Amino acid sequence: MTEPNERPHGPAPETNAAVLDAKGLRALAHPVRLQLVGLLRKHGPSTATRLAERLGVNSGTASYHLRQLGAAGFVEEDAERGNARERWWRAVHQSTWFDDPELAEREPEATMAYLQSVAATYTLRVQRALNELQTMPRAWRDTFDMSDWPLRLTPEEASALHEELRAVVTRYRPDTPEGAATAPDGAERVSVITHFLPEPDATSVPADSSGPGSGSGTEAS
Protein backbone atom coordinates (compact mmCIF):
# COMPACT_ATOMS: atom_id res chain seq x y z
CA MET A 1 0.00 0.00 0.00
CA THR A 2 0.93 3.64 -0.18
CA GLU A 3 1.07 6.87 1.67
CA PRO A 4 -0.94 9.34 -0.43
CA ASN A 5 -0.41 12.29 1.94
CA GLU A 6 -4.05 13.22 1.64
CA ARG A 7 -5.42 16.07 3.73
CA PRO A 8 -9.16 15.88 2.98
CA HIS A 9 -9.68 18.92 5.22
CA GLY A 10 -7.26 21.54 6.45
CA PRO A 11 -7.04 25.25 7.19
CA ALA A 12 -4.21 26.08 4.79
CA PRO A 13 -2.31 24.15 2.12
CA GLU A 14 1.38 23.58 2.60
CA THR A 15 4.10 24.27 0.05
CA ASN A 16 3.89 22.09 -3.07
CA ALA A 17 0.38 20.88 -2.30
CA ALA A 18 -2.40 20.15 -4.77
CA VAL A 19 -5.52 22.11 -3.77
CA LEU A 20 -8.46 20.22 -5.20
CA ASP A 21 -10.85 21.83 -7.65
CA ALA A 22 -13.80 20.07 -9.28
CA LYS A 23 -11.62 18.41 -11.93
CA GLY A 24 -9.08 17.22 -9.39
CA LEU A 25 -11.78 15.99 -7.03
CA ARG A 26 -13.28 13.79 -9.71
CA ALA A 27 -9.86 12.56 -10.82
CA LEU A 28 -8.94 11.36 -7.33
CA ALA A 29 -12.30 9.78 -6.59
CA HIS A 30 -10.80 6.32 -7.16
CA PRO A 31 -8.71 4.26 -4.69
CA VAL A 32 -6.23 3.06 -7.34
CA ARG A 33 -5.44 6.63 -8.36
CA LEU A 34 -4.85 7.67 -4.76
CA GLN A 35 -2.51 4.72 -4.35
CA LEU A 36 -0.62 5.54 -7.54
CA VAL A 37 -0.11 9.15 -6.47
CA GLY A 38 0.99 7.96 -3.05
CA LEU A 39 3.56 5.54 -4.43
CA LEU A 40 5.07 8.20 -6.68
CA ARG A 41 5.22 10.67 -3.80
CA LYS A 42 6.82 8.19 -1.45
CA HIS A 43 9.21 6.30 -3.72
CA GLY A 44 9.82 8.72 -6.58
CA PRO A 45 9.44 8.23 -10.35
CA SER A 46 8.35 4.84 -11.63
CA THR A 47 6.71 3.05 -14.54
CA ALA A 48 3.19 1.71 -14.94
CA THR A 49 4.54 -1.84 -14.88
CA ARG A 50 6.37 -1.41 -11.59
CA LEU A 51 3.49 0.45 -10.00
CA ALA A 52 1.05 -2.22 -11.15
CA GLU A 53 3.16 -4.91 -9.47
CA ARG A 54 3.07 -3.01 -6.18
CA LEU A 55 -0.70 -2.58 -6.32
CA GLY A 56 -1.57 -6.02 -7.63
CA VAL A 57 -3.28 -4.74 -10.78
CA ASN A 58 -2.39 -5.23 -14.44
CA SER A 59 -0.17 -2.72 -16.20
CA GLY A 60 -2.96 -1.63 -18.53
CA THR A 61 -5.07 -0.57 -15.57
CA ALA A 62 -2.16 1.32 -14.04
CA SER A 63 -1.40 3.03 -17.36
CA TYR A 64 -5.00 4.14 -17.77
CA HIS A 65 -5.19 5.65 -14.30
CA LEU A 66 -1.79 7.34 -14.69
CA ARG A 67 -3.00 9.01 -17.88
CA GLN A 68 -6.11 10.24 -16.08
CA LEU A 69 -3.96 11.58 -13.25
CA GLY A 70 -1.69 13.24 -15.79
CA ALA A 71 -4.64 14.94 -17.48
CA ALA A 72 -5.70 16.29 -14.07
CA GLY A 73 -2.20 17.56 -13.25
CA PHE A 74 -1.30 15.20 -10.39
CA VAL A 75 1.47 13.33 -12.22
CA GLU A 76 3.63 14.00 -15.25
CA GLU A 77 5.99 12.09 -17.48
CA ASP A 78 9.61 12.01 -16.39
CA ALA A 79 11.24 12.65 -19.76
CA GLU A 80 14.76 12.23 -18.37
CA ARG A 81 14.05 8.61 -17.43
CA GLY A 82 11.62 7.57 -20.12
CA ASN A 83 12.48 5.97 -23.44
CA ALA A 84 10.73 4.61 -26.50
CA ARG A 85 9.81 1.39 -24.70
CA GLU A 86 8.83 2.61 -21.26
CA ARG A 87 7.17 5.74 -19.87
CA TRP A 88 8.22 6.97 -16.45
CA TRP A 89 5.92 9.01 -14.25
CA ARG A 90 6.52 11.31 -11.30
CA ALA A 91 4.30 13.14 -8.82
CA VAL A 92 3.78 16.86 -9.31
CA HIS A 93 2.90 17.59 -5.66
CA GLN A 94 3.82 16.23 -2.24
CA SER A 95 0.36 16.38 -0.67
CA THR A 96 -3.31 17.02 -1.43
CA TRP A 97 -5.67 19.47 0.25
CA PHE A 98 -9.45 19.63 0.07
CA ASP A 99 -11.21 22.24 2.17
CA ASP A 100 -13.87 23.84 0.00
CA PRO A 101 -17.42 23.56 1.40
CA GLU A 102 -18.90 25.24 -1.68
CA LEU A 103 -17.22 22.74 -3.99
CA ALA A 104 -18.47 19.90 -1.79
CA GLU A 105 -22.00 21.28 -2.13
CA ARG A 106 -21.69 21.52 -5.92
CA GLU A 107 -20.07 18.09 -6.31
CA PRO A 108 -21.63 15.90 -3.59
CA GLU A 109 -21.16 12.59 -5.40
CA ALA A 110 -17.53 13.29 -6.34
CA THR A 111 -16.84 14.55 -2.82
CA MET A 112 -18.24 11.39 -1.25
CA ALA A 113 -16.39 9.16 -3.71
CA TYR A 114 -13.13 10.96 -2.95
CA LEU A 115 -13.59 10.75 0.82
CA GLN A 116 -14.53 7.07 0.57
CA SER A 117 -11.37 6.46 -1.45
CA VAL A 118 -9.29 8.22 1.20
CA ALA A 119 -10.97 6.18 3.95
CA ALA A 120 -10.32 2.93 2.07
CA THR A 121 -6.69 3.90 1.57
CA TYR A 122 -6.25 4.65 5.26
CA THR A 123 -7.81 1.31 6.17
CA LEU A 124 -5.34 -0.53 3.96
CA ARG A 125 -2.45 1.40 5.49
CA VAL A 126 -3.50 0.32 8.96
CA GLN A 127 -3.84 -3.27 7.79
CA ARG A 128 -0.38 -3.16 6.25
CA ALA A 129 1.10 -1.92 9.53
CA LEU A 130 -0.67 -4.73 11.39
CA ASN A 131 0.65 -7.30 8.92
CA GLU A 132 4.21 -6.06 9.44
CA LEU A 133 3.95 -5.46 13.18
CA GLN A 134 5.40 -8.77 14.36
CA THR A 135 8.51 -8.39 12.20
CA MET A 136 9.27 -4.84 13.32
CA PRO A 137 12.03 -4.16 15.85
CA ARG A 138 10.68 -4.12 19.41
CA ALA A 139 11.25 -0.37 19.74
CA TRP A 140 8.94 0.30 16.80
CA ARG A 141 6.35 -2.28 17.89
CA ASP A 142 6.08 -0.41 21.18
CA THR A 143 5.15 2.82 19.37
CA PHE A 144 2.21 1.28 17.51
CA ASP A 145 -1.13 2.58 18.73
CA MET A 146 -4.80 2.54 17.77
CA SER A 147 -6.97 4.55 20.14
CA ASP A 148 -10.30 6.30 20.16
CA TRP A 149 -11.82 8.72 22.67
CA PRO A 150 -15.57 9.36 22.46
CA LEU A 151 -16.11 13.01 23.40
CA ARG A 152 -19.12 15.27 23.72
CA LEU A 153 -18.26 18.53 21.99
CA THR A 154 -19.79 21.47 20.23
CA PRO A 155 -18.78 22.06 16.60
CA GLU A 156 -16.59 24.93 17.80
CA GLU A 157 -14.86 22.72 20.36
CA ALA A 158 -14.29 20.00 17.78
CA SER A 159 -12.72 22.52 15.41
CA ALA A 160 -10.49 23.85 18.19
CA LEU A 161 -9.36 20.32 19.08
CA HIS A 162 -8.55 19.66 15.44
CA GLU A 163 -6.39 22.77 15.31
CA GLU A 164 -4.60 21.84 18.53
CA LEU A 165 -3.77 18.35 17.28
CA ARG A 166 -2.58 19.72 13.97
CA ALA A 167 -0.33 22.18 15.78
CA VAL A 168 1.21 19.34 17.79
CA VAL A 169 1.90 17.23 14.69
CA THR A 170 3.44 20.11 12.74
CA ARG A 171 6.01 20.62 15.49
CA TYR A 172 7.65 17.39 14.40
CA ARG A 173 9.87 16.67 11.41
CA PRO A 174 7.85 16.11 8.22
CA ASP A 175 8.54 13.21 5.89
CA THR A 176 9.94 15.31 3.06
CA PRO A 177 13.31 15.27 1.29
CA GLU A 178 14.34 18.20 3.48
CA GLY A 179 13.16 16.42 6.61
CA ALA A 180 15.01 13.25 5.65
CA ALA A 181 18.22 15.22 5.13
CA THR A 182 18.16 16.55 8.70
CA ALA A 183 16.74 13.46 10.42
CA PRO A 184 18.90 11.76 13.07
CA ASP A 185 20.01 8.16 12.75
CA GLY A 186 17.17 5.76 13.47
CA ALA A 187 14.41 8.06 12.17
CA GLU A 188 11.85 6.27 10.02
CA ARG A 189 8.54 7.14 8.43
CA VAL A 190 5.67 7.22 10.93
CA SER A 191 2.11 7.81 9.72
CA VAL A 192 -0.19 9.77 12.02
CA ILE A 193 -3.79 9.52 10.82
CA THR A 194 -6.56 11.51 12.47
CA HIS A 195 -10.29 11.03 12.09
CA PHE A 196 -12.92 13.41 13.43
CA LEU A 197 -16.21 11.53 13.16
CA PRO A 198 -19.28 13.55 14.17
CA GLU A 199 -22.10 11.35 15.47
CA PRO A 200 -24.98 13.72 16.27
CA ASP A 201 -27.80 12.06 18.20
CA ALA A 202 -31.14 12.24 16.41
CA THR A 203 -32.71 13.76 19.53
CA SER A 204 -30.10 16.54 19.69
CA VAL A 205 -30.62 17.80 16.13
CA PRO A 206 -33.16 20.63 15.62
CA ALA A 207 -36.41 19.48 14.05
CA ASP A 208 -35.84 21.56 10.91
CA SER A 209 -32.33 20.21 10.32
CA SER A 210 -31.64 17.96 7.36
CA GLY A 211 -28.70 16.39 5.60
CA PRO A 212 -25.82 14.25 6.89
CA GLY A 213 -25.91 13.57 10.60
CA SER A 214 -29.66 14.04 11.03
CA GLY A 215 -30.49 10.34 11.06
CA SER A 216 -29.78 7.55 13.51
CA GLY A 217 -26.76 5.29 13.32
CA THR A 218 -25.06 2.32 14.92
CA GLU A 219 -22.84 2.89 17.94
CA ALA A 220 -19.24 1.78 17.36
CA SER A 221 -17.75 2.71 20.74
Regions found by a protein language model. Give the residues of each.
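N-terminal leader segment of winged-helix/HTH proteins
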Residues: M1-L28
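Short, cationic-aromatic polyanion-contact patches
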Residues: R26-V32, T47, E76-E102
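A short acidic, leucine-rich amphipathic alpha-helix
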Residues: R50-E53
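Glycine-centered, phosphate/nucleic-acid-interacting loop/turn motifs that mediate DNA/RNA or nucleotide
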Residues: G73
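Amphipathic alpha-helical dimerization/coiled-coil segments
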Residues: R90-P150
